[in-house]
């Protein structure tokens, strides 16, 4: 499912217009993004957690030359599914 399909599903399930569903979906995504940029953790009980994780510096290799390079530390977004989401996907 892509973003357009998600918006259509939200519009249908909530009886919103596609315009209002688009605003709602975009607002949720923007709010999650802003929270992660600020270093906050988003906890949606039963669904899962969005957070920023630190990836430490490490050594890598240039695949074209084989030269060893240093990959700097970085921050990456992460999602950890909650128990209810895991159970629903597993059919429990």
Curated annotation (Swiss-Prot):
Outcome, altering residue 83 to Q: Disrupts interaction with Bacillus phage SP01 Gp46
Result for mutant: residue 86 to Q: Disrupts interaction with Bacillus phage SP01 Gp46
Any one GO CC term of the record: cytosol
Highest taxon of the lineage: Bacteria
In-chain residues carrying the UniProt-annotated modification Phosphothreonine: 4
Effect of residue 47 to W: No change in DNA-binding
CDD domains given in the database record: HU (cd13831)
Subcellular location field: Cytoplasm, Nucleoid
Effect caused by changing residue 80 to Q: Disrupts interaction with Bacillus phage SP01 Gp46
Keyword field contains Repeat: no
Transmembrane domains' residue ranges: none
Induction data: Constitutively transcribed with 2 transcripts of 0.54 and 0.38 kb.
Subcellular location, principal: cytoplasm
Disruption outcome: Essential, it cannot be deleted; upon depletion cell growth slows.
Keywords: Cytoplasm, DNA condensation, DNA-binding, Phosphoprotein
Subunit structure: Homodimer.
Annotated function: Histone-like DNA-binding protein which introduces negative supercoils in relaxed plasmid DNA in the presence of topoisomerase I. There are at least 20,000 monomers/cell. Capable of wrapping DNA to stabilize it, and thus to prevent its denaturation under extreme environmental conditions. Binds evenly across chromosome, does not display a preference for AT content. Binds ss- and dsDNA in a sequence non-specific manner; 8 nucleotides are sufficient to bind protein.
Family: Belongs to the bacterial histone-like protein family.
Protein name according to UniProt: DNA-binding protein HU 1
Organism annotation: Bacillus subtilis (strain 168)
Lineage: Bacteria, Bacillati, Bacillota, Bacilli, Bacillales
């Amino acid at each position: 499912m892509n973003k357009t399909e998600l918006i259509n599903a939200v519009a249908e399930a909530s009886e919103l217009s596609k315009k209002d569903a688009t605003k709602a979906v975009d607002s949720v995504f923007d709010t999650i993004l802003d929270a992660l940029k600020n270093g906050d953790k988003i906890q949606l009980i039963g669904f899962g957690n969005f957070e920023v994780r630190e990836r430490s510096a490490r050594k890598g290799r240039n695949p074209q030359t084989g030269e060893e390079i240093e990959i700097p530390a970085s921050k990456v977004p992460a999602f950890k599914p909650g128990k209810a989401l895991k159970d629903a996907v597993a059919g429990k």
